[in-house]
Regions:
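DNA major-groove recognition helix of helix-turn-helix/homeodomain DNA-binding modules
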Residues: 77-95
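Short amphipathic alpha-helical elements of helix-turn-helix/winged-helix folds
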Residues: 24, 44-45, 87
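N-terminal flexible/basic segments that precede or flank functional cores
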Residues: 1-41
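Recognition helix of helix-turn-helix/homeodomain-like DNA-binding domains
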Residues: 60-76
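Long, contiguous binding/interaction regions
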Residues: 19, 100-101
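Helix-turn-helix DNA-binding elements, focusing on the entry/boundary residues of the two helices
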Residues: 52, 63, 78-81
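Short basic helix-loop element that most often maps to the first helix and adjoining turn
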Residues: 39-56
């Protein structure tokens, strides 16, 4: 039986699924301000897409700093989040919270 982590790693190889996964976590963060959940989701995506060592090189952020940033007590800057997302092939975008009828 396939482990969930293996299943998730396989699914996150798809660019659209990866983007949706991160977007859902980010949108949830804006609802409940659960930073730990967002950082855990980002860490899962990084591991699925080659690991922290690979992403640290692409993001130009020290590997140990990424481990610390993504820990449950991690404190990260907006710039570092952007760098990690860019290394994953993603970017932040904004959209209106208003629903037009």
């Amino acid at each position: 039986m396939e482990k969930f982590t293996d299943y998730l790693k396989e699914k996150l190889q798809n660019e659209k699924i990866l983007a949706g996964y991160i977007n859902e976590a980010l949108e949830q963060y804006f609802v409940d301000h659960n930073k730990e959940l967002f950082l855990a989701t980002l860490k899962e995506a990084i591991i699925a897409r080659g690991g922290i060592a690979k992403i640290s090189k692409e993001a130009h952020i020290n590997r140990q700093h990424i481990y610390k940033m993504l820990s449950s007590k991690g404190n990260t800057s907006f710039g570092n989040i952007g760098s990690l997302l860019n290394a994953l092939g993603l970017q932040l975008k904004s959209r209106s919270m208003c629903v037009l009828n």
